[in-house]
């Protein structure tokens, strides 16, 4: 199963709130993430930068389904105000995706 990684950036004054909210992610959102096939999902933080890593068979299909989900829409609104633009996101891209160049299982 493919692994994906991308970067987000938190506003400096929102780091504590971001971490607090991720200690209590809504159960309905967790269920939806699993339903669309996301697994082994981790979020790492260094300063303002977040690295999100997960496994997923069909990225575009899952992101489209998550985008239509009302629970996810509410979560995105509540979290969206915590972020700054990521400098390396290109026009037309949703995320600053990273290419996996090595993996040891």
Model-derived features: positions:
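Ligand/cofactor pocket segment of small-molecule handling proteins
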Residues: 1
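Active-site-flanking beta-strand signature of metal-NTP-handling nucleotidyl enzymes
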Residues: 4-9
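Short amphipathic alpha-helical segments
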Residues: 14-38
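Hydrophobic pocket/interface hotspot
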Residues: 18, 22, 52, 62
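Tryptophan-centric aromatic hotspots in well-structured domains and transmembrane helices
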Residues: 26, 41, 75-76
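Short, glycine- and small/hydrophobic-rich beta-strand elements in well-ordered beta-sheets
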Residues: 30-51, 55-59
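An amphipathic, aromatic/His-enriched active-site/gating alpha helix that lines ligand/cofactor pockets
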Residues: 36, 57-94
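Charged phosphate-binding loop/patch that engages nucleotide di/tri-phosphates or the phosphate backbone
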Residues: 92-105
């Amino acid at each position: 199963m493919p692994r994906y990684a991308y970067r987000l950036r938190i506003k400096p004054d929102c780091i504590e709130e971001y971490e607090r909210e991720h200690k209590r992610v809504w159960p309905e959102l967790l269920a939806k993430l699993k339903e669309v096939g996301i697994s082994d999902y981790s979020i790492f933080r260094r300063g303002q930068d977040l690295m999100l890593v997960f496994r997923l068979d069909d990225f575009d299909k899952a992101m489209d389904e998550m985008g239509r989900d009302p629970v996810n829409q509410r979560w995105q609104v509540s979290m969206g105000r915590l972020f700054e633009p990521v400098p390396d996101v290109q026009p037309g891209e949703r995320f600053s995706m990273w290419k996996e160049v090595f993996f040891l299982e």
